[in-house]
Amino acid sequence: QILPKTGRPLLVVGPTSNWVGKTWHPERFIEAISLLTGAGCVLEGAHVLLVGAPNEREMAAPVLQSIPEEQRSEIFGNESLLTVMACLERADLYLGNGSGLMHMAAASGCPTIGLFGPSRDEHYRPYSKWGRAVRTDWSFDKIIANRESHLSKENLMETLPVSKVVEAAIQLVN
């Protein structure tokens, strides 16, 4: 059993992506999860399901380790996509980088926050009634113009503050 049989809210988090440049820092995911699931917030006491590909579990380890074991579950390629979709359909919110999992969340009908920096959110945002793109304070064009090279392995999500993401999530869930 992946999810607990409780009446608690469910927050699904996709803290990884296929390119480090568009991956929000683990520390920021940790802070956002803490704020959203904390006392008095919209997902107070939520169970957190972390999702990603099998080769992304190590990248997600800091986020996993920050959540008490009894408050979290994980799927990193160890379940079918149908199982992931069933979990997304039960979720109160999906929070993650622009990725295939973000698009699955939007398709499931789950309120979805997609995080964007070096991708054009106008093309790749979560397309659904409950989908929202939250992008860095820098535009796509400014990020691309200021990166080291087109093969850059630098993180390009530096200008996306936790407060902006949490505010968007609260508005969406409310």
In which residue ranges do the predicted regions lie?
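Short, conserved glycine- and acidic-residue-centered signature motifs
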Residues: 22-25, 158
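Donor-binding and catalytic core of enzymes assembling or modifying cell-surface/extracellular glycoconjugates
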Residues: 17, 26-117
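Short hydrophobic-acidic sequence motifs that mark active-site Asp/Glu residues
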Residues: 10-12, 33, 133
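Mid-sequence helix-capping/hinge segment at a functional interface
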Residues: 1-21
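Short regulatory "switch" loops immediately downstream of catalytic or recognition motifs
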Residues: 1, 33-40, 136-145
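Nucleotide-sugar donor-binding patch of glycosyltransferase catalytic domains
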Residues: 64, 74-75, 106-173
